[in-house]
Amino acid sequence: RQFRENLYHALDGRTLDYIVVHHMEPDHTAELEDMVLRFPNVQILCTAMAKTMIGQFFGHVYDDRIRVCKEGDTLCTGRHTLQFVAAPMVHWPEVMMTYDRTDKLLLSADAFGCFGALNGHLFADEVDFDRDCLDECRRYYTNIVGKYGPQVKAVLDKAAQLDIAMLLPLHG
């Protein structure tokens, strides 16, 4: 319920045009079916594997609403140009990240995540990162994505080619 309230507040009366599915783990997709029902024209952007998983998770695939994104595909939304970055097996097999070329933001899925929150802050530079976050970032990496070392290295190589002003992980 809180998610929907936050979303409607952010939309400020506008409709939702796109849902970008970075990966299909239930903590990321619990509201997907409800959002598709509430916004009948919304387009779902995801990998081919995520499209298959949507059908497996929800019992049907919204074929008319899904746009499969591959490495390097882009979407111009008007003000923003989004570039999709494949990140398979950085935690789950269907993972992708989104790079906003306009604002230089990398929505990094579970890569670069952290356990915990920033104590009410939105940005890491508003806290003492070394004191308050570093241990939880290490613990997150070790427990969630560390076992996929070669895949994480591949994502780091891709990220190094982007002009990133801010990382926006899905956790932490």
Which residues are covered by each model-predicted region?
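Active-site neighborhood of phospho(di)ester-bond hydrolases with catalytic His/Asp-centered motifs
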Residues: 16-24, 44-47, 106-109, 166-171
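Pre-active-site segment of Zn-dependent metallo-hydrolases
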Residues: 1-19, 26, 38, 42
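Metal-dependent catalytic neighborhoods of phosphoester/phosphodiester hydrolases
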Residues: 30-38
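Phosphate- and divalent-cation-binding pockets in alpha/beta enzyme and binding domains
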Residues: 2, 30-31, 52-56
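Short acidic, glycine/serine/threonine-rich loops at helix termini
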Residues: 34, 56-59, 117-121
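Short, glycine/acidic-rich beta->alpha junctions
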Residues: 24-27, 88-90
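Metallo-beta-lactamase
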Residues: 45-170
